[in-house]
């Protein structure tokens, strides 16, 4: 990820954050925030499903641009969700950086060990 990419995500997140106290009649994002957890999370599920369907379409000769568009929708709604739970893209980027260089198997083993320690085991 380039600095420009990270900057784009952070700028978009700032705009989303600014909608938290906005008028739900004037802003789609404000409306999602106003509706609460279930509306935000339902939107994530819908967008994730659309990503899966678009990916399957690409394998059948569909347009890759449709998949990119659906992923953009999912990322956008994930940014809304992060903001809704008082998190930011920087939190996700930090976690990805922490995992960088670890194999998926190693990362999963470390996560399980941490969970056991947190649960007193």
Swiss-Prot record:
Keywords recorded for this protein, A-Z: Amino-acid biosynthesis, ATP-binding, Cytoplasm, Histidine biosynthesis, Hydrolase, Nucleotide-binding
Main location: cytoplasm
Keyword Hydrolase belongs to the record: yes
Gene Ontology MF, one: ATP binding
Keyword Cytoplasm: yes
Organism superkingdom: Bacteria
Reaction catalysed by this enzyme: 1-(5-phospho-beta-D-ribosyl)-ATP + H2O = 1-(5-phospho-beta-D-ribosyl)-5'-AMP + diphosphate + H(+)
Gene Ontology biological process terms in this record: L-histidine biosynthetic process
Cellular component terms (Gene Ontology): cytoplasm
Enzyme Commission numbers on file: 3.6.1.31
InterPro entries: HisE, PRib-ATP_PPHydrolase-like
Pathway assigned in UniProt: Amino-acid biosynthesis; L-histidine biosynthesis; L-histidine from 5-phospho-alpha-D-ribose 1-diphosphate: step 2/9
Places the protein is found: Cytoplasm
Similarity field: Belongs to the PRA-PH family.
HAMAP family tied to this protein: HisE
Protein name from the UniProt record: Phosphoribosyl-ATP pyrophosphatase
Underlying gene: hisE
């Amino acid at each position: 990820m380039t600095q420009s990419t990270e900057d784009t995500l952070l700028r978009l997140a700032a705009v989303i954050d600014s909608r938290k106290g906005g008028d739900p009649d004037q802003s789609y994002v404000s409306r999602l925030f106003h509706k609460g957890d279930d509306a935000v999370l339902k939107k994530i599920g819908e967008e994730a499903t659309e990503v899966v369907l678009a990916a399957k379409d690409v394998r059948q000769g569909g347009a890759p641009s449709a998949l990119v568009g659906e992923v953009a929708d999912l990322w956008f709604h994930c940014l809304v969700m992060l903001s809704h739970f008082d998190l930011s893209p920087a939190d996700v980027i930090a976690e990805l950086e922490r995992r960088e260089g670890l194999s998926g198997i190693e990362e999963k083993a470390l996560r399980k060990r941490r969970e056991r320690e947190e649960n007193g085991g």
